[in-house]
Amino acid sequence: MASVVSLAGTLGLLLVSALPEVLGDRRSPDRRAHPGDAGQVGPAAAEPRRQSPPSKNQRERARSGALPLGALYTAAAVAFVLYKCLQQGKDEAAVLQEEADKKDSLQSEQHLAQLTQQLVQTEQHLNSLMAQLDPLFERVTTLAGAQQELLHMKLQTIHQLLQDSKPNKGVEVPEPEASIPFLEDFCIEEDEEEAGDNQAWEEPLNWNTGTRNLTPPREMQPTLRRRCRKSAAQGLSHSPHWKEGKTVDGLVKQSLFL
């Protein structure tokens, strides 16, 4: 705004200074033609000149000589002022553009600083979360490893027990259970033997009757059966195959219930 006012003032001063030259001094052509004849012209001669007004042609000639110079001067002054105004306007536009660029760059730097600060805060939050989750990850990993080891040990134990329960190739395989007599068979055989012995001692043998009656009396049968069961149970308890089967079954059940 101040630059515009100064330019307007400069233009006004130039126009005011150009006005006298445009108008000029309208002196008579006699004075212009004979400026040094002051002595020849006396007061008497000056009176008629003063009294006679200048002609119209003389005025037009004076104006036509003065106008082109003043117009050229004024046009040059106006052109110079306009040039200065345009140049100053360009300079002001460049200055404004530089200020706008500086302001934009400053805003960009501030925005970048804010983003950097937010990124640092986010990184700190992530680090704190990872620090809280690390113990949980370690516990889960430890528990998973322990469970895996325990399961592996159980599988190895079961496999070993199954291998131990199988008969070896170099050892003779015992006869099936059908070859082992039942408790009642032992009891019946012993009853028959004892009854036969008692009858042999008490009664004479009758070889003519064909077969002997080895059945013991009814009063002695319960006692004989109890004794047979006890002796059979003791014999089976001393059997190595029975002990091995029992221990293997017990170990398998125990490992499965762990």
Swiss-Prot record:
Keywords: Coiled coil, Membrane, Signal, Transmembrane, Transmembrane helix. GO terms for cellular component: membrane. It is found in: Membrane. Residues 1-24 form the signal peptide. Residues 25-63, 203-222 are annotated as: Disordered. Residues 106-134 form a coiled coil. InterPro entries: CCDC107. Its main location: membrane. Residues 25-35 have a biased composition (Basic and acidic residues). The chain crosses the membrane at residues 66-86. It is a single-pass membrane protein. This is Coiled-coil domain-containing protein 107. It comes from Bos taurus.
